[in-house]
Regions:
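Short, well-formed alpha-helical segments that are part of the catalytic scaffolds
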Residues: 7-26
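Acidic helix N-cap motif at the loop->helix transition within catalytic regions
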Residues: 15-18, 39-48, 92
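A conserved acidic beta->alpha catalytic loop
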Residues: 23, 33-46, 57-58, 84-88
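Conserved donor nucleotide-binding strand/loop of the catalytic core
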Residues: 43-72
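Catalytic-site signature of metal-activated, phosphate-bearing donor transferases
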Residues: 63-71, 89-215, 221
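Short beta-strand-to-loop acidic/aromatic patch adjacent to the donor-nucleotide binding site
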Residues: 71-88
Length: 354
C-alpha cells in the first residue's frame, strides 16, 4: 500500500495550523521542521499529532530549510508532498493521488491555485510540481528553490488532485539578496536568472531588470519563461515596447498575455483598429496553458473589455454590447464595467432600436 508523507518547514503560522492539518491529516506521516516559532505553532501541531523537529537555518536559505524538512521523512515513504502551512489539500485528495500516481511516476503535476479572485473563483493557477518520490530529490536555490533530481524523472499529470494556496496579505518579501546569491552560485541556471530579472522588475530596478533578462534570453529556450521575460522587457524599455511585445506574441502563440498587452498599448494610443485586432487574436486562444505566467486578467475580463471599447469606437455596436456583457460576467463587481454596459445599452436603445 502506498505510504504518503507531508513535509515542510514552518515559523509563526499558528493561525493556519488547524485548517492546514484538517486538509492533510489523511497522510501516513506529517513531518515539520519548526525554524523558530514563538506564536504557539509548534505546540498546536504537536497537540494534533504532527511530528515537529526544532531546527535552525543559519544563514537563512530556503533550500536548506526544505531539504532539512525532507530529510525528516522516513525512508519507507513512497510519495512526498511539500505542503506549506498556508496551502490546503482538497477533500478526497488521497484517493485522487493514489489513482493518478503510476508505478513509473517520480513527480506528479497537478493544478495549483495560487490566489483567488474577489468572487472566489481561481485567480493565477498552474501545474504544480511539489509532489515527488522519496528517493533522489533535493531542493536547490537560496530562494525560489527548485526541486532537482539525480535520477531520471517521469512526470505524470492529473487534473483531479489540486492544492489551494491561501496567502496572508503582506507586502513582497525581500528576495533580492538571496536571488543574487543564487545567481552567483549557479550562474548558468536560466531559471534562477529569470527569477532575478522578475524580482528587479518588482522593485522597479529597470536597468538591472533589462540586463538580466537579456542575459536570460541568451541562455534559455523555455517558451514560458521567455514569454514572461519579453513582456517584462516591454516595461523595462518602454522605447522598445512594441518590439518586445510582438516578439513575445511571435515566440509564444499559446499565451494571451502578449496579445492583451498589445491591445492595451493600442487602447492607450487610441489606435482602435489595432486594439480591436489584438483583442480578437487574444480571444482566439481558448486553451489555458496552466503555467505561472498566465494572468487572471488576460484569461478573464480584460480582452473582452478592450474589444468592447475598440468596437464602440469603430461603431460596431452589436459586438461592443456582446463583449461588454461578457467582460462584466467575468468581473461582476467592477463598477466601471457596469457603467460601460449601461452606457452602451442606453445608447443602442435610444439610437439604434427606437
Amino acid at each position: 500500500m502506498m505510504r504518503i508523507a507531508i513535509y515542510g518547514p514552518t515559523k509563526n503560522q499558528a493561525h493556519h495550523v488547524q485548517a492546514w492539518y484538517d486538509s492533510c491529516k489523511d497522510a501516513d506521516v506529517i513531518c515539520i521542521a519548526d525554524t523558530g516559532s514563538t506564536d504557539g505553532t509548534k505546540e498546536a501541531m504537536l497537540a494534533l499529532g504532527v511530528q515537529v523537529t526544532d531546527v535552525r537555518i543559519i544563514p537563512w536559505r530556503f533550500d536548506d530549510a526544505f531539504n532539512t524538512a525532507m530529510y525528516l521523512v522516513p525512508d519507507d515513504i513512497d510519495v512526498c508532498i511539500r505542503l506549506d502551512t498556508d496551502e490546503r489539500l482538497t477533500p478526497g485528495w488521497r484517493d485522487k493521488l493514489e489513482a493518478a500516481w503510476k508505478p513509473e511516476t517520480t513527480r506528479l503535476r497537478y493544478p495549483y491555485i495560487w490566489n483567488w479572485n474577489a468572487d472566489g473563483t481561481p485567480g493565477r493557477q498552474w501545474y504544480g510540481d511539489r509532489i515527488h518520490s522519496r528517493k533522489g530529490y533535493r531542493w536547490m536555490g537560496a530562494t525560489h528553490e527548485g526541486l532537482v533530481s539525480r535520477l531520471p524523472e517521469i512526470h505524470t499529470f492529473t487534473d483531479d488532485f489540486q492544492i489551494h494556496h491561501f496567502p496572508d496579505p503582506k507586502s513582497k518579501s525581500g528576495d533580492l539578496s538571496l536571488l543574487e546569491e543564487s545567481v552567483r552560485e549557479w550562474p548558468h541556471d536560466s531559471r534562477i536568472k529569470a527569477y532575478l530579472g522578475r524580482e528587479y522588475a518588482y522593485q522597479k530596478i529597470w536597468d538591472k531588470c533589462a540586463a538580466t533578462y537579456k542575459e536570460f534570453l541568451g541562455m534559455s529556450f523555455d517558451t514560458v519563461e521567455r514569454c514572461q521575460a519579453l513582456t517584462t522587457l516591454a516595461q523595462a524599455e518602454p522605447e522598445n515596447k512594441l518590439f518586445w511585445l510582438k516578439q513575445a506574441a511571435y515566440e509564444v502563440p499559446t499565451h494571451r498575455e502578449p496579445l492583451v498587452a498589445l491591445a492595451q498599448h493600442y487602447y492607450e494610443a487610441a489606435d482602435w483598429k489595432n486594439c480591436y485586432d489584438y483583442s480578437h487574436r487574444a480571444l482566439k486562444i481558448t486553451k489555458h496553458p496552466m503555467d505561472y505566467t498566465c494572468t487572471p486578467e488576460a484569461w478573464g475580463w480584460q480582452p473582452h473589455d478592450l474589444l468592447s471599447i475598440a468596437a464602440w469606437n469603430l461603431r460596431l455596436y452589436d459586438e461592443c454590447l456582446e463583449q461588454a456583457k461578457t467582460a462584466l460576467e467575468k468581473s461582476p463587481d467592477d463598477t466601471r464595467l457596469k457603467n460601460n454596459l449601461k452606457l452602451i445599452e442606453d445608447f443602442i436603445a435610444k439610437n439604434l432600436r427606437g
